[in-house]
Amino acid sequence: MVGHSESSTDAVIEPTSEELLAEQVRVFNKMKGSTNFNRVAEDVYPVEVTKSKLVCEMVVQHQHLNSKGTLHGGQTATLTDVITARAVGVTVKDKGMASVELAVSYLLPVKVGDVLEITAHVLKVGRTMAFTDCEFRRKSDGKMSAKGKHTLAFLPNQPGISVENGTQF
């Protein structure tokens, strides 16, 4: 039939970017005061979300530093892990995930007080794995301070993230 369109009951309603952002803010807020290792992301704040990208910001504080007074490499690696997994979790909600590969290249030092913009991209989501990358940029000059890569496997019979309790990272 000419001019026929699907009924509104058949259409899939996609969440808006504002709804996706609100969900990620709730997830990251659950990390505040966490007693597990996710606590290293408690100062991260999501600022932009799409189905293939998550942008967060973090002000570097003393607890994020190494003995040389710059952002600790382990902090950067953990943020790569957590933020890229959350980027995948924007669309993959029903599966648990585990890291298969995580790599970070450290390009420039970041000091206390610097604001980092952390952008995670979902490159591909397959049946059993997801591939991501992550860029850390100093907001003051836009220079890239670190570049990460993270490959995740989907775990059979494991729950996805629960926004209510912030579990499953």
Swiss-Prot record:
Enzyme superclass (EC): hydrolase
Record InterPro entries: ACOT13, HotDog_dom_sf, PAAI_dom, Thioestr_dom
Keyword Hydrolase part of the UniProt annotation: yes
GO MF annotation list: fatty acyl-CoA hydrolase activity; identical protein binding
Keywords for the protein's UniProt record, in alphabetical order: Hydrolase
The EC number(s) this enzyme carries: 3.1.2.-
SUPFAM superfamilies: Thioesterase/thiol ester dehydrase-isomerase
Pfam families: 4HBT
Source taxon at top rank: Eukaryota
NCBIfam families the UniProt entry points to: unchar_dom_1
Family statement: Belongs to the thioesterase paaI family.
Name the record gives this protein: Putative esterase F42H10.6
